[in-house]
């Protein structure tokens, strides 16, 4: 399997707690039918941030 490269999120919505955060679509290898899993990761000034309290 080829794990997709990180890329900007498509239609990420917004990050309520950190409006200026950047969304990246991050994939990593996983034990499932696709061989990988992906998630939206929000970062601001190099730090991962949570978008919801």
Swiss-Prot record:
Keyword Zinc-finger found: no
Species assigned in the record: Nerita versicolor (Four-tooth nerite)
Keyword hit for Metal-binding: yes
Keywords from the named record: Disulfide bond, Metal-binding, Metalloenzyme inhibitor, Metalloprotease inhibitor, Protease inhibitor, Zinc
GO terms of molecular function: metal ion binding; metalloendopeptidase inhibitor activity
Quaternary state and interactors: Monomer. Interacts (via C-terminus) with human CPA4.
GO biological process assignments: negative regulation of endopeptidase activity
Protein name: Metallocarboxypeptidase inhibitor
Positions annotated to bind Zn(2+): 53
Domain of life where this protein originates: Eukaryota
Lineage: Eukaryota, Metazoa, Spiralia, Lophotrochozoa, Mollusca
Task performed by this protein: Metallocarboxypeptidase inhibitor. Has an inhibitory effect on bovine CPA1 and CPB2, human CPA1, CPA2, CPA4, CPB1 and CPB2, and porcine CPB1. Does not inhibit D.melanogaster svr (carboxypeptidase D). Shows no activity against serine proteases subtilisin or bovine trypsin, cysteine protease papain, and aspartyl protease porcine pepsin.
Gene3D superfamilies: 2.10.25.90
Cystine bridges: 9-23, 15-51, 27-38
């Amino acid at each position: 399997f080829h794990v997709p490269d990180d890329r900007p999120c498509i239609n990420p919505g917004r990050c309520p707690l950190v409006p200026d955060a950047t969304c990246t679509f991050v994939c990593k290898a996983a034990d499932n039918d696709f061989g990988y899993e992906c998630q939206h990761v929000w970062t601001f000034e190099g730090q991962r941030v949570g978008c919801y309290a």
